[in-house]
Amino acid sequence: MSISFNLLHREINTRARLGKLKTPHGDIDTPIFMPVGTQATVKSMTPDELENIKAQIILSNTYHLYLRPGSSLIDEAGGLHNFMNWQKPILTDSGGFQVFSLSDLREIKEEGVYFRSHLDGSRHFISPEKAIQIQMELGADIIMAFDECPPYPSDYDYVARSLERTVRWARRCKKAHEREDQALFGIIQGGVYRDLRKQSVEALIDIGFPGYAIGGLSVGEEKEKMLEVLDFTVPLMPENKPRYLMGVGAPEDLVEGVIRGVDMFDCVLPTRIARHGTVFTSQGRLTVRNAGYERDFTPLDPECDCYVCKNYTRAYIRHLIKRKEILGVRLTTYHNLYFLLSLMEKIRGAIKEDALLEFRDEFLRKYLNKASI
């Protein structure tokens, strides 16, 4: 099987939906947040811990795994699931975003992208066909088309030309994809331009994919601009296919994205800020390494029931982070991922009760106020 997507409920006051995404490695309740495991590991977390916090699917990075240890080695190991001992669903990105982030080290051609490795300067080439080959060897349940990712801001003409190439590449990706146990998603581009987003959606629907992602957001544009693009893009997307907003993971953005009809999200934010001693709480972000928490013997978030908040204090975690102890990063990462996955569970509950706007208002009132931190 590849995947199937069933819509279970549409919220009456918003565009939010409840869905069930079926994959060869299990079912996913949407809307969902996907922890990022760039190097075939969610940094500092074991697969058992990810299951404990109810992670349903994780994301890995094609670019990094292509460079190290190599997709052929992972294929030899039986694919990503066996290699990393994670038997639930996996999504791999195409590597496009990372390659196009190497602005001084890459050259774009119609056939693909030539680039130099950020590790050792070695020269490489990735085409749409190569990106699909790598992802077929990695063996994820959901894989992504290879797209061109314009920087923000970019002028209209550049984005228009880039979009046309992305559509041509999407066709090549679909033609190259041969694994029936994988689903290939197309990626909508078009920058902040309404007509280009519309053009992108229509072209990808014409090619035909089992799911569609919104790319090119959360790349430096203002929050209001991102929401505006979602407002005019999501309604154009097929109702009966999963909708994936790439690279978005701040709690407030997850809520707003779901309200606009998005089903899937991923972001390195929760794990990245955790490594620097910042955590999500019901009252907003908290930087536990700050001196004010040296003698604070309360949990990171008194309203959280995760393992970390039940067993450790801000003072202790601050001590670990300041001393650069590995356990400190493990605890902050565990808490942050639990916080987001728990938030998504609450969002799904609110959609079921047709009460998402009330949930949003109450959540943001506390989260953005930060009065008690």
UniProtKB/Swiss-Prot annotation:
<comment type="subunit">
    <text>Homodimer. Within each dimer, one monomer is responsible for RNA recognition and catalysis, while the other monomer binds to the replacement base PreQ1.</text>
</comment>
<dbReference type="GO" id="GO:0046872">
    <property type="term" value="F:metal ion binding"/>
</dbReference>
<feature type="binding site">
    <location>
        <position position="335"/>
    </location>
    <ligand>
        <name>Zn(2+)</name>
    </ligand>
</feature>
<feature type="region of interest" description="RNA binding; important for wobble base 34 recognition">
    <location>
        <begin position="271"/>
        <end position="275"/>
    </location>
</feature>
<comment type="pathway">
    <text>tRNA modification; tRNA-queuosine biosynthesis.</text>
</comment>
<keyword id="KW-0479">Metal-binding</keyword>
<dbReference type="Pfam" id="PF01702">
    <property type="entry name" value="TGT"/>
</dbReference>
<dbReference type="InterPro" id="IPR002616">
    <property type="entry name" value="tRNA_ribo_trans-like"/>
</dbReference>
<feature type="binding site">
    <location>
        <position position="304"/>
    </location>
    <ligand>
        <name>Zn(2+)</name>
    </ligand>
</feature>
<keyword id="KW-0671">Queuosine biosynthesis</keyword>
<feature type="binding site">
    <location>
        <begin position="93"/>
        <end position="97"/>
    </location>
    <ligand>
        <name>substrate</name>
    </ligand>
</feature>
<dbReference type="InterPro" id="IPR004803">
    <property type="entry name" value="TGT"/>
</dbReference>
<feature type="binding site">
    <location>
        <position position="189"/>
    </location>
    <ligand>
        <name>substrate</name>
    </ligand>
</feature>
<protein>
    <recommendedName>
        <fullName>Queuine tRNA-ribosyltransferase</fullName>
        <ecNumber>2.4.2.29</ecNumber>
    </recommendedName>
</protein>
<keyword id="KW-0328">Glycosyltransferase</keyword>
<feature type="binding site">
    <location>
        <position position="309"/>
    </location>
    <ligand>
        <name>Zn(2+)</name>
    </ligand>
</feature>
<feature type="active site" description="Nucleophile">
    <location>
        <position position="266"/>
    </location>
</feature>
<dbReference type="GO" id="GO:0008479">
    <property type="term" value="F:tRNA-guanosine(34) queuine transglycosylase activity"/>
</dbReference>
<feature type="region of interest" description="RNA binding">
    <location>
        <begin position="247"/>
        <end position="253"/>
    </location>
</feature>
<dbReference type="GO" id="GO:0002099">
    <property type="term" value="P:tRNA wobble guanine modification"/>
</dbReference>
<dbReference type="GO" id="GO:0005829">
    <property type="term" value="C:cytosol"/>
</dbReference>
<dbReference type="GO" id="GO:0008616">
    <property type="term" value="P:queuosine biosynthetic process"/>
</dbReference>
<feature type="binding site">
    <location>
        <position position="306"/>
    </location>
    <ligand>
        <name>Zn(2+)</name>
    </ligand>
</feature>
<dbReference type="InterPro" id="IPR036511">
    <property type="entry name" value="TGT-like_sf"/>
</dbReference>
<keyword id="KW-0808">Transferase</keyword>
<keyword id="KW-0862">Zinc</keyword>
<feature type="binding site">
    <location>
        <position position="147"/>
    </location>
    <ligand>
        <name>substrate</name>
    </ligand>
</feature>
<feature type="binding site">
    <location>
        <position position="216"/>
    </location>
    <ligand>
        <name>substrate</name>
    </ligand>
</feature>
<comment type="similarity">
    <text>Belongs to the queuine tRNA-ribosyltransferase family.</text>
</comment>
<dbReference type="InterPro" id="IPR050076">
    <property type="entry name" value="ArchSynthase1/Queuine_TRR"/>
</dbReference>
<feature type="active site" description="Proton acceptor">
    <location>
        <position position="93"/>
    </location>
</feature>
<dbReference type="GO" id="GO:0101030">
    <property type="term" value="P:tRNA-guanine transglycosylation"/>
</dbReference>
<keyword id="KW-0819">tRNA processing</keyword>
<comment type="function">
    <text>Catalyzes the base-exchange of a guanine (G) residue with the queuine precursor 7-aminomethyl-7-deazaguanine (PreQ1) at position 34 (anticodon wobble position) in tRNAs with GU(N) anticodons (tRNA-Asp, -Asn, -His and -Tyr). Catalysis occurs through a double-displacement mechanism. The nucleophile active site attacks the C1' of nucleotide 34 to detach the guanine base from the RNA, forming a covalent enzyme-RNA intermediate. The proton acceptor active site deprotonates the incoming PreQ1, allowing a nucleophilic attack on the C1' of the ribose to form the product.</text>
</comment>
